[in-house]
UniProtKB/Swiss-Prot annotation:
Keywords, comma-separated and alphabetical: ATP-binding, Decarboxylase, Gluconeogenesis, Glycosome, Lyase, Nucleotide-binding, Peroxisome
Annotated pathway: Carbohydrate biosynthesis; gluconeogenesis
Name of this chain's protein: Phosphoenolpyruvate carboxykinase (ATP), glycosomal
Gene Ontology CC entries for this record: cytosol; glycosome
UniProt main location, coarse: other
Top-level taxon of origin: Eukaryota
PANTHER family, A to Z: PHOSPHOENOLPYRUVATE CARBOXYKINASE (ATP), PHOSPHOENOLPYRUVATE CARBOXYKINASE ATP
Single Gene Ontology MF annotation: phosphoenolpyruvate carboxykinase (ATP) activity
Bilayer-spanning residue ranges: none
Complexes and interactors: Homodimer.
Provenance organism: Trypanosoma brucei brucei
Listed EC numbers: 4.1.1.49
Gene3D superfamilies documented for this protein: 3.90.228.20, Phosphoenolpyruvate Carboxykinase, domain 1, Phosphoenolpyruvate Carboxykinase, domain 2
InterPro entries recorded: PEP_carboxykinase_ATP (IPR001272), PEP_carboxykinase_C (IPR013035), PEP_carboxykinase_N (IPR008210), PEPCK_ATP_CS (IPR015994)
Organism taxonomic ancestry: Eukaryota, Discoba, Euglenozoa, Kinetoplastea, Metakinetoplastina
Length: 472
């Protein structure tokens, strides 16, 4: 018997179905949908594959990040997904857009058996109007999320029961063996990292906001380094928290929502994000109080990588059409696990390209499956290594050209550890200190400050501010 197909349901309808079909789904005290992704609570980069076809083989930087898969193997994985769908009672389909700039917008169709996944992508992408749905037609990309079904390790190129495979030729993604919702959104980011350079535009793993005078700031950083938190500034308008493109006209957000790390979320210092976790939002792998259903944001009993996903409209002042001008300030967020980086440094154009391509930072615990329990130093090119398709220097050259053309200022901001190493009990840079530094960047104070060369690093930093201020 064919499954009942639920197409383009509203958020309340998807919440209702999740509560009916998913045994561990429940409402939080503020109405968000609390869900579990079970065995996989982070991305599975070792199981990511890109199909090696003639149209992309020369563009892709093949290696440990972009591992090859044949077209035949991809078709076998897609068959597993479709066969699984055929055994299910319900199938949820969402038609959405990726990209607020309509010149580069992609039509995306998602197939999934879990209402939570459908609601997640409804939040993370851009929901069409009724008129747009009527003329939606065939999608540009299709995601087959059969995460409850296992991949077949005997398929050539598949090495476990988990597979996240992307085919640029057929414009499809197949997900097997993982129910972690983040695989879908990062799949779309990977697509844009391939498509946008073809048009001369820079795809960025970055957040962005804009001031009242139209000044745009872009924050580059790996997951957990502060992109979502720091871009949600009550004095500025949010453009987006994770995925953007820099075109000839300015910056646009690929997504229609935010996917924030929830562990340690503080309603006093991160009020905008806290208040966004309400009805329509998804709370992924969070622990609830049994009686009150309040989220315990400090509970790591399920995982360290607890997440909340909510639409942009849940943030006061977020741009409904998330398109803005060229960046005045670019901030590289580095999670320094050694505690040796200054709180802030100013970079020249040459230094900016070097640090961008090098991407020194640290893996935040839990973001990837099997990651360490403490922050470990890594080099993630372009502050988005897991999602790059082409060689990092290609994106680095694009950034350098755009920075020079639009006279963008570049800053290196340490959101990592101060006064010691992460593995020896040091604490992360206080959020209030980081916010104060960003405020000083925005109001021009740091541009007029007295700088000196940081010994051994060559970049310039605020005189007398080699370590975290006494306010720490």
């Amino acid at each position: 018997m064919a499954p009942i197909i639920h197409k383009n349901l509203t958020a309340p309808e998807l919440v209702e179905w999740a509560l009916k079909l998913e045994k561990d789904s429940q409402l939080t005290a503020r109405g968000a949908l609390s869900v579990r992704s079970y065995a996989k609570t982070g991305r599975s980069p070792r199981d990511k594959r890109i199909v090696n076809t003639t149209d992309v083989t020369d563009n892709v930087d093949w290696g440990s990040v972009n591992m090859k898969l044949t077209e035949e193997s991809f078709e076998k994985l897609k068959t597993i997904a479709k066969d699984y769908f055929a055994t299910c009672k319900h199938l949820f389909v969402m038609d959405c857009f990726a990209g607020h700039d309509e010149r580069y917008r992609l039509k995306v169709r998602v197939y999934t058996t879990r209402p939570y996944h459908a609601l997640f992508m409804r939040n993370m992408l851009i929901v069409p109007t009724l008129e747009e749905l009527q003329s939606f037609g065939e999608p540009d990309y299709v995601i087959y999320n059969a995460g409850e079904a296992k991949a077949d390790p005997t398929v050539p190129g598949v090495t476990s029961t988990t597979s996240v495979a992307l085919n640029f030729k057929t414009r499809e993604q197949v997900i097997l063996g993982t129910e972690y919702a983040g695989e879908m959104k990062k799949g779309i980011l990977t697509v844009m990292f391939e498509l946008m350079p073809r048009m001369g535009h820079l795809c960025m793993h970055a957040s962005a906001n804009v001031g009242k005078s139209g000044d745009v700031t872009v924050f580059f950083g790996l997951s957990g380094t502060g992109k979502t938190t720091l871009s949600a500034d009550p004095r500025r308008n949010l453009i987006g928290d994770d995925e953007h493109v820099w075109t000839d006209r300015g910056v646009f957000n690929i997504e229609g929502g935010c996917y924030a790390k929830a562990i340690g979320l503080n309603p006093e210092t991160e009020k905008d994000i806290y208040e966004a976790v309400r009805f329509g939002a998804v709370a992924e792998n969070c622990t609830l109080d049994r009686r009150t259903h309040e989220i315990d944001f400090n509970d790591e009993s399920i995982c360290k990588n607890t997440r909340v996903a909510y639409p942009l409209m849940h943030i006061d002042g977020a741009l409904s059409k998330a398109v803005a001008g060229h960046p005045k300030n670019i901030i590289f967020l580095t999670n320094d696990a050694f505690g040796v980086m200054p709180p802030v440094a100013r970079l020249t154009s040459a230094q900016a390209m070097f640090w961008f391509v090098m991407g020194y930072t640290a893996n935040v615990p839990g973001v990837e499956a099997g990651s360490a329990r403490v922050a470990r130093p890594i080099f993630s090119s372009c502050f988005g290594g897991p999602f790059l398709v082409r060689h990092a220097t290609h994106y680095g050259q694009q950034l350098a050209e755009k920075m020079e053309k639009h006279n963008s200022r570049v800053w290196l901001l340490n959101t990592g550890y101060a006064g010691g190493r992460a593995d020896r009990g040091a604490k992360r840079m206080p959020l209030r200190v980081t916010r104060a530094i960003i405020d000083a960047i925005h109001d021009g104070t740091l541009d007029q400050a007295d700088y000196e060369v940081y010994p051994g690093w060559a970049f310039t930093f605020l005189r007398g501010l080699r370590t975290c201020p006494q306010a720490c």
